[in-house]
Amino acid sequence: MSNAITMGIFWHLIGAASAACFYAPFKQVKQWSWETMWSVGGIVSWLILPWAISALLLPDFWAYYGQFNLSTLLPVFLFGAMWGIGNINYGLTMRYLGMSMGIGIAIGITLIVGTLMTPIINGNFDVLIHTEGGRMTLLGVFVALIGVGIVTRAGQLKERKMGIKAEEFNLKKGLLLAVMCGIFSAGMSFAMNAAKPMHEAAAALGVDPLYVALPSYVVIMGGGALVNLGFCFIRLAKVQNLSIKADFSLSRPLIISNILLSALGGLMWYLQFFFYAWGHARIPAQYDYMSWMLHMSFYVLCGGLVGLVLKEWKNAGRRPVAVLSLGCVVIIIAANIVGLGMTS
């Protein structure tokens, strides 16, 4: 496996680790509605950071974006909005199916859709079937799915042992939302594919290859922000027991603490895609769609490991932990299969 591909896989692992940890600061926020907390974190992650980093990277911020016509920017924005819808459905999926089943189905679907639809859209699916490297990366995708399934099973065993149930279990509604979540969440993969002209333009301006994808986040995450913030603001305006005014009527130290914690969560959320861009830059162009598979499978891997570190599995017993460990090993094997396939 080449050093470039090894580093690409490593950066995807770092990004996924940040994704697995980003909600920890949000859990420390006190006496705020979820909508206010999510909005503050989202403003940091979807608006402030993409704009600020792009302004630092680009020699002429407005000239860069002004060179693209609507036919280039609109698909990138709409795929970002599609991914934003997936974000909202993710929370509802957990509500009706529980964490383990919800994550397993949603992540499994988005892993397949986001990874395999991109070469189909680009007319390159034959690379997966008719080349040795393509067949090997395809094998890696299916091994990763097995790993996700094993980790999901471990989570179910843990929930059963600890008596954890879905907030409002509804299999029919939960499965529908999980499928929608999986499909719509793949919008980020499609957006990155649609943003290739933006990446090429950034490279032409002398932006380091590791950073060329970051300016496109202004548009991609702008679409996601529109959906997520719109959802939160509508709820804050219409739901009777929710109020921004009440959330900001707390003591000043608590407000400052909540803002800082939400901002930290937003920063960690953004870092997942900051390092995703680094990993994406190291993946061979003909296999760039594999970035999504690596990110999502590593997200499940890191989520399990973070849970162990935070002692969330302490009272689950040996069997769930053993099954979790097996699933993590399978995901690591899948990443290595994909890496070897990309060097073939």
Curated annotation (Swiss-Prot):
Substrates-to-products reaction catalysed: L-rhamnopyranose(in) + H(+)(in) = L-rhamnopyranose(out) + H(+)(out)
GO cellular component: plasma membrane
Chief place where the protein resides: membrane
Subcellular localization(s) per the UniProt record: Cell inner membrane
Membrane topology, from the record: Multi-pass membrane protein
Gene Ontology MF, one: rhamnose transmembrane transporter activity
Function: Uptake of L-rhamnose across the cytoplasmic membrane with the concomitant transport of protons into the cell (symport system).
HAMAP family: RhaT
Protein's UniProt name: L-rhamnose-proton symporter
Organism, scientific name: Salmonella gallinarum (strain 287/91 / NCTC 13346)
Taxonomic lineage of the native organism: Bacteria, Pseudomonadati, Pseudomonadota, Gammaproteobacteria, Enterobacterales
